[in-house]
Amino acid sequence: MIPVCQKFEQTFIKDILSLLVLYMKTKMINLVKKEEEDKLNQITESIHDKLTVSSNDNKVDPNLSSIVFTGLYYILKVALKKKVSNQIFVADITDLKLPQNLITDLTNIYNTQSKDLAERSNNDKILFPQLSSFKWRVDVIISSSFTSRVLNPVILMEMNDTNGKSKVFEVSIDNFHKLRYNAAKLLKDLEDLEQIQILSKLENK
């Protein structure tokens, strides 16, 4: 997210923050009630459409603006849940190396609207399907021709989630090693982020 938002114009960043605050103020969620889930979907689609229009107006890939929107949303949400002080909030988002104009705008939102946003965001909870099992094994595909016979090992992976959905796919040996590297790097990055108070793990309540 950070390398992306560093390339955005300040006016576009302000548009994203305005939509972010609007989203956090309007999404009172109780997924036990079907009508509340429908309302959440409508709000999400509306914000997404507005973000897409703003992205197109600023000649920005909507996928990139969605990444920045989501990242800023979780920074604010976690800070509100942790109830960090204004000073710690500024110090932590500065450590993240966000653009200075974004730090200023984000700090202003946190200083002036944190009470209202906290009351709303702390009362909602969205539960997405979770990974229930992940299996993998090495398989060998035999490719034969008139002149040669080649053994091509691949990794077969199977993922299952708590909704009962299953997905099976193949990964080449090279991509499997890249996956191992990126998974290890991600775990290290998460460990580093946990040292920042507003991004530390939330305690289960």
From Swiss-Prot:
Alphabetized InterPro entries for the sequence: COMM, COMMD5
Pfam families: COMM_domain
Source species, domain of life: Eukaryota
Domain COMM residue range list: 130-194
A GO CC annotation given for this chain: nucleus
Subunit structure: Component of the commander complex consisting of the CCC subcomplex and the retriever subcomplex. Component of the CCC subcomplex.
Family indicated by similarity: Belongs to the COMM domain-containing protein 5 family.
Job of this protein: Scaffold protein in the commander complex that is essential for endosomal recycling of transmembrane cargos; the commander complex is composed of the CCC subcomplex and the retriever subcomplex.
Name used for this protein in its record: COMM domain-containing protein 5
Species name: Dictyostelium discoideum
Gene, per the UniProt record: commd5
